[in-house]
Amino acid sequence: MQHPREENSIVVELEPSLATFIKQGFNNLVKWPLLNIGIVLSNTSTAVNEEWLTAVEHIPTMKIFYKHIHKILTREMGFLVYLKRSQSERDNYITLYDFDYYIIDKDTNSVTMVDKPTELKETLLHVFQEYRLKSSQTIELIAFSSGTVINEDIVSKLTFLDVEVFNREYNNVKTIIDPDFVFRSPFIVISPMGKLTFFVEVYSWFDFKSCFKDIIDFLEGALIANIHNHMIKVGDCDETVSSYNPESGMLFVNDLMTMNIVNFFGCNSRLESYHRFDMTKVDVELFIKALSDACKKILSASNRL
């Protein structure tokens, strides 16, 4: 019998500055939203609202919304979870399977329920106190992925709950919800001495290799776009930005992208420091080709899992 969850690592050997570039890009660009926009609609349990919202915020949703990874990373889509559960003598606990899961199309604000794997029944979230017939405990809550704009249009699509209650409770808490995009990285990534390593979790109910490819494809596209948009000031060196003086041959390095790219072409630079370097050695298209080849190598390694 296949275990529902396995920890694995994907390892590739790369030129050290390129490995560092990919690792830093992953950590800065691959942002999976947390469920930080949480609203408790009803709660007679012994856990206070803040405890529920903290637990729900960190639900590992990527293993549920795996069919929509690319559009969630590009923020074309968001998602929400909804829980309405009452304690009974027979069922005295809550698992992740008790939630309903919905994908949100940000263009239309359409809300569509997604299938949930039965394996979620094995992930316990809360245990009620001892059951008493006259004081059964209940909880109802909803939580949206970070970055979701709560407006009348999207609220009108929440046909599974009492909109009046939602509006009242949302108005009570909206001022304390973090307006910034709150996220986590899908995996831990390290790159000691060019040994780029992804520490991943593989689940039995979906094709991890396909999902991992979606993530790497997104990362490659985002990195290439950033490379094309990146500028180094030419002229007198300015310590507020990366800059290069062609007359003196001095380069001031003030950002990670500049550092990694020039190091790939033989410089031994560090952040916030001056280096004598011939910038004509830098071939951006050659670096992009090396990046694309590295991404192919990463995907090839993932296929061996």
UniProtKB/Swiss-Prot annotation:
It catalyses: RNA(n) + a ribonucleoside 5'-triphosphate = RNA(n+1) + diphosphate. The keyword Nucleotidyltransferase applies. GO terms for molecular function: DNA binding; DNA-directed RNA polymerase activity. Keywords: DNA-directed RNA polymerase, Nucleotidyltransferase, Phosphoprotein, Transcription, Transferase, Virion. Disulfide bonds: none annotated. GO terms for cellular component: DNA-directed RNA polymerase complex; virion component. It is found in: Virion. InterPro entries: DNA-dir_RNA_pol_35kDa_poxviral (IPR005059). One of its GO terms (biological process) is viral transcription. Its main location: virion. It is an enzyme of class 2 (transferase). Pfam families: Pox_RNA_pol_35 (PF03396). Its EC number is 2.7.7.6. The DNA-dependent RNA polymerase used for intermediate and late genes expression consists of eight subunits 147 kDa, 133 kDa, 35 kDa, 30 kDa, 22 kDa, 19 kDa, 18 kDa and 7 kDa totalling more than 500 kDa in mass. The same holoenzyme, with the addition of the transcription-specificity factor RAP94, is used for early gene expression. Part of the DNA-dependent RNA polymerase which catalyzes the transcription of viral DNA into RNA using the four ribonucleoside triphosphates as substrates. Responsible for the transcription of early, intermediate and late genes. DNA-dependent RNA polymerase associates with the early transcription factor (ETF), itself composed of D6 and A7, thereby allowing the early genes transcription. Late transcription, and probably also intermediate transcription, require newly synthesized RNA polymerase. Belongs to the poxviridae DNA-directed RNA polymerase 35 kDa subunit family. This is DNA-directed RNA polymerase 35 kDa subunit. The gene is OPG156.
